Every structure is written in C-alpha cells, then in structure tokens.
C-alpha cells in the first residue's frame, strides 16, 4: 500500500495521503497492543499486512511475508517525506513526530545486540523472498535482513532531524537514538558482488525478485 502513495505529493495529490495517515494513527493503538503482547515492547509496530480495522498482528499464510515487523516503521518514513515535501511544521509536530516517536520506542526494546555489537531485528524476513541456507534448506525467517536495517537507518535519521527542526532539546534521547543508529549493521556486499539481501550471504532462491 505504501508504495502506491509515493507519487501523491509529486503529482499534486498530497491530500490523498490523509487516509493512509489516518490508518497509521489507528495502527498506533492496535500496534501498541501487538508490541506488548508479542514482543513485550513499548511503542507500537505493524507487520506486512493490515486491514480496514488496522490489524497490526501478523496475518496471512505465505511464509515469507506475515512475520515482517517493519510495516509501521516504513509508513513512518512516508509521513516524514510528506513533511519534507510540504514543509508543514504543524504536520511534523502534531502528526508525524508523535507517530515516529512510538515507532522508535518499539525498536528500543525490540532490537537485539549480537556479539559484534550490532543491533539486529529478528526474527524477521526479507518480504516476499526466500533464501537457501548453507545447509541447503529453503527459508525466510532470519536476523537483520538488509531492508530492515535500511528502514531503521531512515527512521532514526528522520526522527533526529525532526527533533532538530522543531528545536527540541532532548540530549539524552538524541544520544540514545544516535547510538542505536550507529550500531545498525552496515550494508554488506556478497561474494558475487551483490548487495546482500540478508545479514548472512545466503543464496537467493528467486534471483530476479
């Protein structure tokens, strides 16, 4: 759904974003329940799909989609990009930042620090794609797919930028988010020259995906 709105502002149809933003407002409520019950985390999250009723829990039967917990974070970035296009400070302060704050809060609890000191999402997946593991098994669940880390890099950067624009003096909050941002795993290159879709250099089962 989010991708269908990418051109709304550019096409002079910015007001058409409102139903999506209203849905995201509802997801902060349902997603806070899911965050607590599924992950024992604060803030809110949403998964790969939602419904008219703003369901935030995993849904569907395709193994490479439902358990992706980054849906809300991805939508938050769209809210921030709407601000960048419109420079509507009221929208940034009263709509985008409160939602982004709740999304960032979720990842404060959800992220896992590995032995290398990187903060990883997981269990997660690279939506709608699967890999072949080093033992030859086809799989979807993994830790820290590249898409997750990239979305988080955008989300944390956007939230820090929003605090700066609004003149918010919250040094402890800023330092914590900056530390999380710095601890995200870097984008890696595979042995055959690709940007790695997963944290490990797995073989793609659908190279054209």
Q: Which role fits each region the language model picked out?
A:
Residues 1, 41-94, 108-175:
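The feature captures the catalytic groove of carbohydrate-active enzymes
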């Amino acid at each position: 759904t989010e991708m269908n709105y990418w051109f709304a502002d550019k096409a002079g149809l910015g007001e058409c974003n409102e139903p999506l933003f209203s849905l995201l407002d509802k997801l902060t409520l349902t997603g806070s329940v899911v965050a607590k019950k599924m992950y024992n985390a604060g803030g809110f999250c949403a998964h790969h799909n939602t419904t008219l009723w703003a369901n935030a829990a995993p849904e569907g039967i395709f193994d490479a989609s439902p358990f992706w917990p980054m849906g809300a974070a991805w939508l938050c970035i769209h809210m921030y990009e709407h601000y960048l296009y419109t420079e509507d400070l009221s929208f940034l302060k009263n709509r985008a930042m409160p939602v982004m704050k709740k999304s960032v809060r979720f990842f404060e609890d959800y992220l896992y620090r590995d032995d290398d000191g990187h903060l990883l999402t997981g269990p997660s997946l690279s939506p709608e794609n699967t890999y072949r593991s080093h033992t030859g098994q086809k799989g979807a669940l993994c830790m820290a797919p590249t898409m997750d880390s990239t979305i988080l890099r955008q989300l944390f950067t956007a939230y820090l930028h929003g605090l700066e624009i609004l003149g918010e003096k919250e040094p402890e909050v800023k330092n914590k988010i900056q530390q999380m941002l710095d601890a995200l795993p870097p984008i890696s290159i595979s042995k055959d020259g690709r940007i790695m879709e997963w944290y490990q250099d797995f073989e793609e089962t659908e190279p054209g995906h």
